[in-house]
């Protein structure tokens, strides 16, 4: 018997030894589902499967044919607004990228990205090598523009994180001019532009803006050596290269040159209709310690250049290079940044001859550690200004150091903005942990600010059309609505026995709210949740609130949340079906329900099960096609697609 027992134990140990040990090499290979994208017509789903460390894969799935294709190392997927083309880049192998970074080699030692363009009808794939970046209009059919790598110029850059956004490349002041190729994918028409450093489509795909830069003249190596030996005269102005800003009409590829000067121009911005255009730029010397920036505005009827000499510009303030201009949705207002003129650094001081101190006072707004952390951000701080495009030569400063931020209202269409200031509570927040804020209605024509709310410890939500400011006060746990026209405030949950703050909060602080889910059309009402259910509060203050899930959530211990399935739709239709994410607190099941706000009945269950899913639901813009993930503690997240949530 002892012999048999020993033999049995040896067998167990042998098989146990065959198991692969759990180390970095194992969990580096673990995979997870990444972001998902559905074509507007719902016929195509793109999703990523990412490795913890290594090369991920992109999958393109046909919801019609139930087939899919795999593309290793793909990223930056875009499905054109007409749902006819898929565009993405393919990166070098992860091991090659890592080797370049580990060895601190220059980027030109690495294979460049490739661009793939797939015709979704024919499955024809066009591959373009050595692509630095690409863009396609969000709502403009089948156009694509891509900037090729400048392989003639050797890079002097350190290796960068390839996952960073391409927008940083667009504003890279050291970018080398290269070839920009624009293609109308629907017709095959192609146009190339040389020496391009920046480019941008209008949202509707009707216009393309790009900036060209005159390349540096090639110098004889002998002359370069002589220049190295000469002492550099930093006082002598060094001019920028000659740049030109151009607009391309994408119907006929006609070019309109707007600017041609020695300078640096960036932040190319169109309005929604592509009939107005703005950008920032400087024509100061490249080695000036303080540069003067201009805001350029162009339209069919009027052009304007704004700078520190413009009417109504605050004294000793300038146009900010650190805030991109932004048109209102209706194109009648243009928001941009202004800032106090920077003080030039004294380059004559010798650092070793002067003490460098960090001095802190108990009266400072922030702890010194916070000040140092935010130093670069504070040096680039911009304040908001606006101009009316009917009179673009006049600006109105909206924010300033005592009211240092604003929120634009109704996508910028409103004649006023929401001013926000935390100046009065900054020092206090060092020990309370919460910043109380004051709120103002700021007139976009005059800049006059009228305070309507003081010392709010909570959060404020402007309604989509700007008729109301709904806010939650953490200190009393109540919801309020401020009527902008009537200048009156109403407590929304007055008289309700339901608690709208965290019922299980057990810390010595004020509890947070469960959240505001959104507004209904025309600023009619607001949807706010308690622990389980959703409530509709009518902003006119005359109608009693309704529990739109009819108490079903609290009765069954199911918590409901809404979805935002279309970013272009900013409010709920009270009579349309809306989908709700559901989570059962008792058995931990999750699922999806549907209801209508106007009916206030028990929501209809579509699916509920022993999994966690539906939290990250995405929808096709023009079709009833949905994608979601489901997972359990035993099964990793899987991707599903459905048109009714009953079959998948």
For each predicted feature, which ranges?
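An N-terminal hydrophobic leader/cap segment in hydrolases
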Residues: 633-648
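Sec-dependent N-terminal signal peptides
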Residues: 2-11
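Beta-propeller folds
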Residues: 6, 15-625, 631-637
């Amino acid at each position: 018997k002892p012999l048999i027992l020993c033999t049995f134990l040896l067998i167990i140990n042998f098989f146990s030894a065959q198991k692969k040990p759990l180390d970095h090499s194992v969990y580096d290979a673990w995979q997870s589902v990444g972001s998902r994208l559905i074509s507007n017509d719902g016929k195509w789903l793109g999703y990523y499967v990412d490795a913890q460390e290594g090369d991920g894969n992109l999958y393109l799935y046909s919801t019609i044919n139930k087939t899919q294709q795999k593309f290793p190392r793909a990223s930056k997927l875009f499905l054109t607004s007409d749902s006819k083309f898929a565009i993405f880049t393919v990166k070098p192998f992860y091991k090659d990228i890592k080797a370049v970074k580990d060895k601190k080699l220059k980027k030109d030692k690495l294979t460049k990205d490739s661009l793939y363009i797939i015709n979704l009808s024919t499955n024809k794939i066009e591959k373009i090598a050595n692509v630095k970046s690409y863009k396609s209009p969000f709502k403009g059919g089948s156009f694509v523009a891509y900037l090729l790598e400048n392989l003639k110029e050797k890079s002097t850059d350190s290796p960068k994180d390839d996952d960073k956004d391409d927008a940083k490349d667009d504003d890279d002041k050291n970018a080398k001019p290269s070839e920009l190729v624009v293609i109308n994918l629907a017709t095959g028409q192609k146009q190339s532009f040389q020496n391009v450093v920046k480019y941008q489509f209008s949202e509707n795909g009707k216009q393309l803006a790009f900036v060209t830069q005159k390349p540096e003249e090639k110098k004889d190596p002998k002359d370069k050596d002589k220049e190295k030996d000469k002492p550099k005269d930093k006082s002598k102005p060094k001019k920028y290269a000659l740049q030109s800003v151009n607009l391309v009409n994408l119907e006929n590829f006609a070019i309109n040159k707007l600017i041609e000067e020695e300078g640096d121009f960036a932040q190319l911005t169109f309005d929604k209709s592509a009939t107005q255009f703005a950008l920032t730029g400087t024509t100061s010397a490249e080695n000036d310690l303080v540069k003067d920036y201009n805001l350029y505005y162009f339209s069919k009827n009027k052009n304007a250049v704004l700078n520190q000499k413009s009417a109504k510009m605050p004294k000793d303030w300038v146009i900010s290079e650190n805030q991109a201009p932004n048109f209102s949705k209706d194109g009648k207002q243009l928001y941009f940044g202004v800032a106090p003129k920077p003080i030039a650094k004294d380059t004559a001081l010798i650092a070793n001859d002067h003490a460098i101190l960090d001095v802190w006072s108990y009266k400072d707004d922030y702890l010194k550690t916070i000040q140092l952390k935010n130093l670069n951000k504070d040096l680039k701080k911009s304040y908001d200004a606006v101009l009316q495009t009917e009179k673009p030569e006049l600006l109105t400063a909206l924010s300033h150091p005592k009211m240092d931020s604003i929120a634009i209202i109704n996508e910028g269409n409103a004649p006023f903005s929401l001013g926000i200031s935390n100046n009065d509570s900054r020092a206090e927040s060092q020990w309370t942990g919460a910043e109380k804020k004051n709120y103002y209605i700021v007139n976009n024509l005059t800049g006059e600010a009228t305070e309507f709310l003081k010392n709010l410890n909570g959060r404020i939500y402007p309604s989509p059309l700007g008729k109301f400011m709904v806010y939650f006060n953490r200190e009393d746990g109540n919801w309020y609505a401020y009527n902008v026209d009537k200048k009156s405030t109403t407590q929304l949950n007055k008289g309700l026995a339901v608690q709208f703050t965290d019922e299980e909060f057990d810390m010595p602080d004020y509890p947070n709210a469960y959240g505001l889910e959104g507004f209904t059309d025309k600023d009619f009402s607001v949807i706010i949740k308690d622990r389980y259910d959703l409530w509709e509060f009518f902003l006119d203050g005359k109608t009693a609130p309704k529990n739109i899930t009819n108490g079903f959530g609290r009765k069954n211990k199911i918590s409901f949340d809404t979805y935002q399935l279309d970013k272009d739709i900013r409010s709920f239709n009270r009579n349309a079906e809306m989908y709700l994410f559901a989570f059962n607190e008792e058995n931990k099941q999750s699922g999806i329900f549907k209801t209508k706000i106007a009916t206030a009945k028990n929501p209809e269950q579509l699916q509920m099960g022993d999994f966690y899913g539906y939290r990250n639901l995405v929808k096709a813009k023009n079709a009833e096609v949905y994608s979601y993930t489901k997972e359990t503690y035993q099964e990793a997240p899987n991707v599903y697609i459905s048109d009714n949530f009953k079959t998948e």
